[in-house]
Amino acid sequence: MVGSLAGMSPLQGAATYSGTKAGLRAFAYALADEVRESGITVGVVSPGPIDTGFIMNEIDNVEDIVFSQPMSTAEAVADAILSIARGEQTEVTMPASSGKLVTLSYFFPKLRRYMRPKLYAKGRKNKDKYRKRNA
């Protein structure tokens, strides 16, 4: 299944998106436990932004904070999906550093609130770079 880092740490301005991705993640973990003994593997890939035409076409509608982290390639996400399908992992977060940060912010919500303005500022700068790159 393909989730999102926003399902691990809520994305301001995208409550519905974050909520559905959190539900998908919980479903994947529960289902993985239910079918494990039958040899079926279930997992979730939780990427941040993916460098595709879709995100670049919608860049003005995407929250700045999304661009505070490196974008993954579609190929890297596909590789992660294959890793899940082979049963090597239950979850892959991409990029891994962002996965660690959202896990930390889950346990320490005040840290998330403290970091948010800094991540928005970084994301704004990166967003401008992406706009120029694709101009």
Segments (PLM) and residue ranges:
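SDR active-site lid
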Residues: E34-A96
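Active-site loop immediately N-terminal to the catalytic Tyr-X3-Lys motif
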Residues: L11-A15
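C-terminal tail/cap regions
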Residues: Q69-P70, E75-A135
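Conserved alpha-helical elements of the SDR catalytic core
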Residues: G23, A30-L31, V35
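Residue(s) in the substrate-gating loop at a strand-loop-helix junction
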Residues: S4
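Active-site helix of classical SDR
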Residues: T20
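Conserved catalytic-site region of short-chain dehydrogenase/reductase
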Residues: G7-S9
